[in-house]
UniProtKB/Swiss-Prot annotation:
The name this protein goes by in its record: Transcription antitermination protein NusB
Protein source organism: Rhizobium leguminosarum bv. trifolii (strain WSM2304)
S-S bonds: none
Family under the similarity heading: Belongs to the NusB family.
One family name in Pfam for this protein: NusB
InterPro entries assigned to the protein according to its UniProt record, in alphabetical order: NusB-like_sf, NusB_fam, NusB_RsmB_TIM44
Amino acid sequence: MNDDKTERPVKTANQRGAARLAAVQALYQMDVGGTGVLEIVAEYEAHRLGQELDGATYLKADAGWFRSIVSGVVRDQTRLDPLIAAALQDDWALSRLDSTVRAILRAGVFEITDRKDVPVAVIVTEYVEIAQAFFDDDEPKLVNAVLDRIAKQVRGETKK
């Protein structure tokens, strides 16, 4: 084990993963706090992405990826929400979902619909892992099922 405190570069994939997590947190904060997109992006870029906050150091994130997800979800929410609602079970309304789950699904669906350069398997896996970071129960399974359904509908493929 190396005790060397030198900073190692963070791989691009990890920076995108960190950006996805930060985007979900920002979308959640916007949903429950009514914060605007410009304000939230500025706050995260100045004080959170790759920064230390309350003794915890945030992983360096791809700021462009973060901005793309947050602004894309806000811009396209009226297109994304019906896709999510249609992929839920008949007795579930999008408004019944936990705010964190809504943020995860919106970000994941945005990437599925708008980031065709990213494989479905990567998108679904990343957002299921984010769900697992917040929930122990059925929520990660729900995220997996909904994103898989939407990927099949939009791209004609599912996570393999």
